[in-house]
Structures are given as C-alpha cells and as structure tokens.
Amino acid sequence: IKGLVDKTDATSTEASASEMGASPYTSQVISDMSKQSINAALAQQITDLEKEVGQAEEGEAKLELLQQLANKWDDIAKPIPQGYIYEEMAQQNPTVTYWLKAGDAYRKGYTNLQDTALASALTTKAIHAYESAIELDPSNLSAKTGLGASLVVGGGNPMTGISLLQEVVKEDPKNLEANRALGLFSLQSQQFDKAVERFITVVEQKPDAESYFYLATGYEKIGLRNEAISAYQKSKELAADPTLSQYIDRQIAELSKSN
C-alpha cells in the first residue's frame, strides 16, 4: 500500500514520445539500479543470465533466455526491469501478449514511484507498449484499459484516457482495472460519488486493502461516515502496513467523534 498515505503525486510529470527517445533510462541502467536493492548472489545470477542473453542469436533460444530473466525479476517483485525485458521480447517477436506484459510491468513500476523523472519515462513506455498491442488487436480490452489508465496518469491527454476507459466499461461493466482507474480519476477530480460507485464494483470482485482505502476516502468525502469507518476497517484488516494502519486509526477516530 506504499504511497496511499503519502499524498505525493509522483507520476504527475507529463511525458512525450520525444522524451522516450532521449531517455537516460536504458535497460542496462535500470538493471543496475534494480540490483542495488537485492542480495549480491541473486544480482550475480541475473548478471550471468544477462550475459547469456547478450551472446545469444535472435530466435527462440534468446526469447527463452529473456523469459527466464523476466521471471527472475518477477520473483523478487521488480516490475521495472521486467518491463524492459518484455519490450525487447515484443520487438523481436511482436505479439499482443508481449506488448501487454511490457505495458503492465511499466504501469506497475510507475505506480507510486517517487522518482518523478523515471515515472514519466515509464509512463511514456507504457503508452507505447499498449498502443503497439492495440495496433495488433484493436478490440483488446486489456490494452485499451492499460492505455487509458496511462494516459490519465501522465500522457498529457487525460480525457482521451477517460474516453478509452469508459469505452471499456461500456463493453465490460465489471472490468476491474478500468473501474479502478476511473475510480482513481474520480477521486483526483473530486467526483467522490462516482469514485464510490467505481470502487464498490472493484471490491465486489477483488477486496484488497488499497481499494477499500479509496472507497473509504470516497465515503468520507461525501459525508457517509459509518460507511467510511466500515471501509477503513476493512482496509486495515487486509493491509500489512503499520503506517497505513496508524493513519486509518486516526481517520476512524476523527470520524467517530463526528458521529
């Protein structure tokens, strides 16, 4: 739940396609940055695998090595380098699956990231990945959802993103990711009643601490205190974050005083 209590908007920097070309965040730079926070033995395993990838010829064997590398990063919850790997795989073998995996990894990577420059670069890369997936499959709802969410966050054209997300929920009213993204936008734009509707749909399908937190925030903002307290309590039950729990306790105490 990192970033829920800290209100810093780490992904507000607008990105453009030209920035991606000039980005200092190469695959190697990202890999080196990511290795700094893991143990030396695991970092060496990844380095060795990267050398194998570099020596491999284009084709199935190289794709298999890249998949092994992506899996290594996934095992330790490092989506940013994983995104770069899936993008390389998509460039070698352009499929909707690879482009979607790249976009999803980039989007997961930029969410709540406090490095605004890197977040901007990742948002741009996510947009490119989802657009590439849509070129291959124009009706793909996952790609439309990812693109819409990325445009809302930092693509410089949030209303286009909103239109895409609304298109998704029109076709698939219960779509989890589209409802979540629309709910977050509703909170940011202070449309709290709409946010509540979206997050009710989300928690019905996937009751997690983050979604209940946002639902509680929406309830609180429209004056439904009892509902807000209940949703905050649900969030606390599902969270494994002492900082968030302390924040929720304070919110519940304030709401209880008001009753």
Residue ranges of predicted features:
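Position-specific recognition of the canonical hydrophobic site in helix A of tetratricopeptide repeat
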Residues: 74, 107, 152-153, 187, ...
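Residue-level recognition of tetratricopeptide repeat
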Residues: 71, 91, 104, 149, ...
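Helix-start (N-cap) detector for alpha-helical repeat units in TPR-like alpha-solenoids
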Residues: 63, 96-100, 141-142, 176-177, ...
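Canonical tetratricopeptide repeat
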Residues: 68, 101, 105, 146, ...
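Short coil turns that delineate tetratricopeptide repeat
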Residues: 60, 93-94, 138, 173, ...
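Structural signature of tandem alpha-helical TPR/SEL1-like repeats
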Residues: 43-46, 77-84, 113-129, 154-167, ...
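Amphipathic alpha-helical repeat scaffolds of TPR domains
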Residues: 21-29, 44-48, 59-68, 94-113, ...
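N-terminal leader/linker segments that initiate helical-solenoid repeat arrays
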Residues: 1-80
